[in-house]
Structure formats: C-alpha cells, structure tokens
C-alpha cells in the first residue's frame, strides 16, 4: 500500500496541463476499460457545466466508476485512461469528486482549482501579458505579472469587483459543489449526504447576505432580487478566456433577456417556480405516484432544497423541474441560445466563475425568496430560544482597538505554471489583491446560574446596523442579512465564565490551502486531512466596512449543546473546521438545530430588546477599511 505522500505525488499530474495529451506522462496506456464505455460524449474543448443535465450525467458516470474502483492502482489506471478522451473540465470535476470520497485517498489534497484552471480566475489580458514576459526572461527566473482590472467606475457594479471576482470566494463555490454533487446517489456510492438540500439553501443564503453587506460597505443599496423572467438584465463582461478552446466567455450586454434553449425554455422555469410556490403554500410536495410528502419543520427545508437545486434527491424532478441549475445555464446563453454562433457560454455556467457575475446574487436572492416563503409558514421560535440559567453578560471584540476590526487589501501570488506549459523551469505567477482583516478575538462573559457544569454551543452572527440611506434595520429585515461568523461548543462551569475564541478558528472558514508546488514537496501528507476545504476563505470572514467606520451588530447566543448534539462529530479528527457551510465527512450534520438558527424564521417582535432572552446578546462592532 503506497503512503499518502506517494499517492499525492502520483495524483498531481492528472491536474497539470489539462489540455495536453498525457500518454508520455504516465507510461504505457492500457486498453480502454469497458467501464468507461459511453464516456467522451461531451467533446474536448467544450466548456463543462455542472449545472447542465447532460454534462452532469456523463460526469456522474465517471466519478461513480472511479469511486467504486477496488484499489488505488485501479483508480489511477482508470484516471489515466479517461484523461485521453474525456472533456477537460468534466475530467477534473469527476476525478476531484472521486478523490474527495475514496477512502484510500484520505489525506490526499486536491490542488487549488485556481492553479489548475487559472483562466477561470485571471483575466485574459493578464495571461497574455504573462506569455509575453516569458520570452523576455531567462528560463530559470521567476516571473510575476500584475493582474489587470476588468472594468471601471462607469459601471457602479464594478465597486464590488474585488468581492465578486475574489479568487478564494470563487474557489469555495467550486469546491462546495464537489463535496455536494447534485447527482450524488447514496445507493450507488453507499454514503449519505446528510441535510444536503438544507445545506444548498443555507450556503447560498449566506452568500447573498454577505454580498449585501459588501454592497452596504460601498454605499450601495441591497440588491434587487431577480423576479421577472422577461425583464432586461444588467450587463457583465468577465474578461476571461478559456484555456482549452481559446475563446472568451460570452459577455452579456446591458438589456439582454432570457431566451429559449434547445434543452430548456423560459416557460419551463416559470412553470417550475409556480409549482414550487404551490407546494410551499399547500405544505406538501407530490412524488411521481401522487403521494404527498409534507414540508414539515424537521425535513421540509431539506426536501425543498433538493427540489429547487435540483439534485437526485428531488422527490419529483419531472414535475418540479430543475429551476436553479437550468437558470444558471439559460442565463449563460442569452447571446447564443441555440448555439448557432458556437460561442462559449457566460460565466454563470461554471461553479468556478459564476460568482463574478452580479446576476448570480440576484438569481440566488430570488431562489432564497422561495425558501423564505416556506420559512414564513413555520411558527416563529419562542421557547426554543431559551437556555435557562445561562446569561450572556457582555461581549467584546479584542483587536488593536476594542470592538473595532480593521480591513485592508493585501497582495498574493497565484502560480500559473502548472496549467500552461511555458517551456521553462522558473515559475510564472500572477500578483493580485484580495480583501483581508486583522486577526481578532471574541471575549464573551457568561454566567451559569446552575450548580453543575453545562455544555453550550456558542453561535456568533454579524449584520449591518443601517441601510445605505442611514435608516436602522429593524429585526425583521436584519435577520436575512445576518452572516454566520462562528459556531463552537464550550463547557460552562457554575458561576462566571470567560470564553475567548480567535477569528482564525471560525467554523465557517478554512485557514489555508496548499499550493500545487507545496503538495509536490509533501507539505500536506497527513491521514487526517481537512475534508471541508470547501470552507469560506478566512480573509473574507467579515465584510469590508468603510473608511469612516461602518457599524455592525454582533450577535452572540448560547444554546444547550447536549440538546443540539448529533452523532460523534470530531471523534474521527476529520472535518473539524468549516462545518457550518460544508457539513462533516461521512457523519450527520453536527448540529440538530436548523441551519441559520435563530435567524432562519420570521421574528415576531417590534424591537431587538423585545426578542432577546438572557442567553442572547447584541453588541456594536465597527469595521473600518484602510486603503
């Protein structure tokens, strides 16, 4: 049995120079395995989309075959064979899903997708500049080029480009859809994805809440949800070009409307929306046999999430359709819906690029509005909010200045040498800016009025205090803007307890991702690797704020951890980070409460003090941005 380090070394070449032939890289090509029959339908050079039903069908066939390989050597052989003729993007997607879910790949890390496909993250002008620089420098010299801007102030939405086009944010979205494939079939791979539909709802809801906080940080109004399938859309140009076919991602001029495609029509999407809203209002969904499944408090959001995406867990895909996925596809094809011009689709077609487009957030707020219709049907929390005998006395944030968190932009380097064969030994890198924040620590003083120790779950959220016009958000509007910062368990001794927690330890984020070169050097060869590397980038844990100091409400709540505990999460040492958005490997989601609790349901209170219980606390935090 090869070591983890050896497995890592042997897997990495599958992710290098993905558009090139690999016959001379892996040795003698064995005869094509019959299990790969039927693959290769999606041609090489075509942009793969894991939102497209036909693309997903072929990708699923490949990753299921790879997961079921009995040995690691057999797995490598099939990866080797498939790479010769399977579509480049589909291949990387399927192999990545397999690596994340094979038991004998535990401890093996995926190389960053931004190094595998930098053309999905870096403007084509920048890549062109890199290719020019290569000719001007010795082969062993490191080359660094600065990333080019993709717009200017003529477009107000460009103020948010730093966020929408952030490399870490887009990589997170790509990785999340690897961990939770829409076509996952537990009966085939013998593993259940617990609360997968609810995670789909919650992760994307949090993306929308975070995006609105960034808009407010820049003096912009919260986004207007997509709501009319026949309304002209705003324009967007990504300045990206595909490295596998040389053509740019289609841009969308201002004023375009959705058009019917061969695969799906606008009317199909409208019909799906109406049927989903009918189900929510009736309180149940109908399976193909006419049997009714109630959308109850315990499972309703999970059932609904599976239908909306739609995943293989949908109770009736033929009736309810695939609103979310086909929406992405049809929005990416507004300029060439029938393929007559043979254009690339727009960035909305790809999980690694779709967050760049402003319409992504409006589309997902539209999707979230349907989930919220369901949440409105549930009884607002009352006794569930209480944790009797536990009182949160004070909360503060310790940083350079108390209750003030500073943000700024920092430089980082992206190595593109493993995607493009520059014919040189020295690395070629792109320098880019990204938002970051100073490290900070929560200090929470809690009183346990009982005589025994108690196990508590600490839930921390953050939301903007005012809208772009200076009006204070009431609790009803604020709840949908609250972003989760952390969730962890602690033990409360009788009497006063001081809880301290560093921002770097957030349950939402990942600390670091190893580069391709670091993986080559054996930096990440540990059996107990972090499965949930789909976590949010820690640099973007908090919103940008502004130079004057933007006021936010920091919310801390303690709940009974024993009451909320599910399974034995953490016992394996796997996936102890980033569980809020990504769940836990081969385990139940480690929190019995609904995701987003207590802000996932309507709040029936006229003011924040009226809603609060002793185990809950709001305080004011200022986020100041320095250029």
UniProtKB/Swiss-Prot annotation:
Binding site for Cu cation 2: 324, 328, 364
GO CC, any one term: extracellular region
Keyword Disulfide bond among UniProt keywords: yes
Tissues expressed in: Hemolymph.
Pfam families in the cross-refs: Hemocyanin_C (PF03723), Hemocyanin_M (PF00372), Hemocyanin_N (PF03722)
Record's keyword terms, sorted: Copper, Disulfide bond, Glycoprotein, Metal-binding, Oxygen transport, Secreted, Transport
Binding-site residues for Cu cation 1, renumbered to this chain: 173, 177, 204
Keyword Metal-binding part of the UniProt annotation: yes
Note: The two copper ions bound each have 3 nitrogen ligands (presumably contributed by His residues) and share a bridging ligand (possibly contributed by a Tyr residue) in addition to binding oxygen.
Quaternary organization: Tarantula hemocyanin is a 24-chain polymer with seven different chains identified.
Protein name: Hemocyanin B chain
Gene: HCB
């Amino acid at each position: 049995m090869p070591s983890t380090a050896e497995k890592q070394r042997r897997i990495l070449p599958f992710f290098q120079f993905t558009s090139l032939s690999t016959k001379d890289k892996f040795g003698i090509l064995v005869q094509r395995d019959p299990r790969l029959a039927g693959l290769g339908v999606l041609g090489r050079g075509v942009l793969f989309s894991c939102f497209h039903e036909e693309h997903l069908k072929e990708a699923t066939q490949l990753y299921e075959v790879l997961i079921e390989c009995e040995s690691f050597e057999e797995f490598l052989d099939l990866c080797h064979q498939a790479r010769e003729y399977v579509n480049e993007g589909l291949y990387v997607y399927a192999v990545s899903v397999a690596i994340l879910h094979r038991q004998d790949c535990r401890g093996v890390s995926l190389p960053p997708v931004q190094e595998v496909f930098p053309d999905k993250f870096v403007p084509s002008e920048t890549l062109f500049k890199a290719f020019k620089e290569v000719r001007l420098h010795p082969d062993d010299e490191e080359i660094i080029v600065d990333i080019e801007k993709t717009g200017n102030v003529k477009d107000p939405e460009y103020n948010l480009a730093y966020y929408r086009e952030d490399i870490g944010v887009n990589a997170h979205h790509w990785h999340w859809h690897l961990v939770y494939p829409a076509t996952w079939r537990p009966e085939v791979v013998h593993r259940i994805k617990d609360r997968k539909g609810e995670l789909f709802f919650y992760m994307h809801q949090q993306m929308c809440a975070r995006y609105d906080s960034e808009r407010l940080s820049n003096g912009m109004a919260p986004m207007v949800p997509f709501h009319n399938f026949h309304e002209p859309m705003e324009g967007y140009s990504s300045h990206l070009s595909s490295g596998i076919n040389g053509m740019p991602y289609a841009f969308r001029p201002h004023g375009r409307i959705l058009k019917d495609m061969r695969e799906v029509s606008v009317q199909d999407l409208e019909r799906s929306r109406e049927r989903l809203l009918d189900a929510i209002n009736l309180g149940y969904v109908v399976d193909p046999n006419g049997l009714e499944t109630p959308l109850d408090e315990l499972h309703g959001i999970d059932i609904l999430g599976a239908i909306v995406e739609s995943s293989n867990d949908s109770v009736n895909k033929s009736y309810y359709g695939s609103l979310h996925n086909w929406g992405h596809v049809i929005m990416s094809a507004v300029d060439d819906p029938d393929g007559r011009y043979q254009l690339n689709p727009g960035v909305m077609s790809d999980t690694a690029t779709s967050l760049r487009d402003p319409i992504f957030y409006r589309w997902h707020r539209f999707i979230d509005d349907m989930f919220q219709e369901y949440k409105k049907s549930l009884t607002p929390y009352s006794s569930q909010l209480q944790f009797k005998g536990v009182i949160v006395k004070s909360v503060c944030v310790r940083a350079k200045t108390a209750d003030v968190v500073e943000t700024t932009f920092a430089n980082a380097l992206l190595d593109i040498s493993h995607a493009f064969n520059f014919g040189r030994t020295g690395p070629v890198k792109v320098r880019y800016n990204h938002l970051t924040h100073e490290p900070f620590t929560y200090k929470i003083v809690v009183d346990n009025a009982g005589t025994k120790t108690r196990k508590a779950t600490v839930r921390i959220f953050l939301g903007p205090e005012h809208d772009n016009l200076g009006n204070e958000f009431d609790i009803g509007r604020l709840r949908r803007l609250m972003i989760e910062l952390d969730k962890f368990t602690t033990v409360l001794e009788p009497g006063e307890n001081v809880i301290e927690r560093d921002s770097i330890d957030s349950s939402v984020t990942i600390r670091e991702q190893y580069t391709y070169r670091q993986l080559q050097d054996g930096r990440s060869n540990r059996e107990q690797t972090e499965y949930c590397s789909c976590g949010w980038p820690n640099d973007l844990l908090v919103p940008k704020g502004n130079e004057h100091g933007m006021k936010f409400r920091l919310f801390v709540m303690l709940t009974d951890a024993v009451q909320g505990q599910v399974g034995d999460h953490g016992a394996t040492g796997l996936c102890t980070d980033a569980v809020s958005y990504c769940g836990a490997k081969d385990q139940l989601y480690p929190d019995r409460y609904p995701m987003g609790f207590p802000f996932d349901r309507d709040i029936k209170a006229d003011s924040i003090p009226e809603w609060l219980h002793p185990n809950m606390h709001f305080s004011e935090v200022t986020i100041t941005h320095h250029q």
